[in-house]
Amino acid sequence: LVGHLDTGADGRHPALRGAIRHFAEFDDLGRERRPGPRAYDPDGHGTHTAATIAGRKVRGTLVGVAPGARLASAMVIEGGEVVARVLGGMDWAIGRGVRVVSMSLGFPGYWPDFLALTRLLRGRGVLPVFAVGNEGAGTSRSPGNYAEALSVGACTRDRKVPRFSSSQRFRRGADAVVPDLVAPGVGIVSARPGGGWQAMGGTSMATPHVAGLAALLMEAAPKKTADEIERALFESCRLGPEMTADRAHRGLPSGPRALRLLG
């Protein structure tokens, strides 16, 4: 079960039918709205990221990274990113028993507001996979810049880091650079509310690739912990010929390599 905190998700889209196990919507005070609505998405961002994680095959080769995964999807971005909504969604996801949380959102700079819940996710054996941001080198967003998060930047199909992908160095020991790794985040085609498809770009699109890959590895190696899954992902990474560690850190992960590392 993968936690998905975004603008919601269109549960009627063919690629997401049967994929959304839980859905919730939160108000500006971080309270769950009841009765809960059927899964929907007034924006499109969340439907795109949800289908990247767990989209079922509809036609051709369009399919999510982990098409057998189920989602606990929370609408926490509605007319802007509100801290209380995100905190409410994170707490709700913990209560649903997720093993991975994918958050393609963030607040510019370093905000400590989400640190306690991110640490709680870790303490519960949940892998927090968060976007680093889209403001370029020398910048990052919270909670994607926490040491406790698996921070994701973007890369192109030819394994280059696009200018928009954020990266930043912090004074905190060995793991001082964010993002931790990069994933495809340019021209990504995924679901659009209403049954269609659209291409989008950003670290928002890269993050669900990594969350989906983590879910696949957890399915293949169910006895492995979130920390072990993360370690395998990190050790599977390789820098592309034009990637640098200050922008891509470890580089691009490989599912087959990570699975071999898990034994």
Question: Which role fits each region the language model picked out?
Answer:
Residues L1-H4, G30-D43, E135, P162-S165, ...:
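N-terminal domain-start motif of subtilase-like serine proteases
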Residues L1-R33, H48, T52:
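Acidic-leg catalytic submotif of subtilisin-like serine proteases
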Residues D6, A24-E25, R141-E219, K223:
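Extracellular S/T/G-rich loop segment that most often corresponds to the catalytic His/Ser-adjacent loop
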Residues G8-G11, D28, V58-R59, I77-G80, ...:
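Solvent-exposed loop/turn segments at secondary-structure junctions
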Residues R33-G109, V152-T156, C237-G240:
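Subtilisin-like peptidase catalytic core
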Residues V76-E148, D175-A176, A191-T207, D246, ...:
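Substrate-binding/access-modulating region of protease and related hydrolase catalytic domains
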Residues V100-S102, E219-G263:
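C-terminal subdomain of the subtilisin-like protease fold in secreted/lumenal serine endopeptidases
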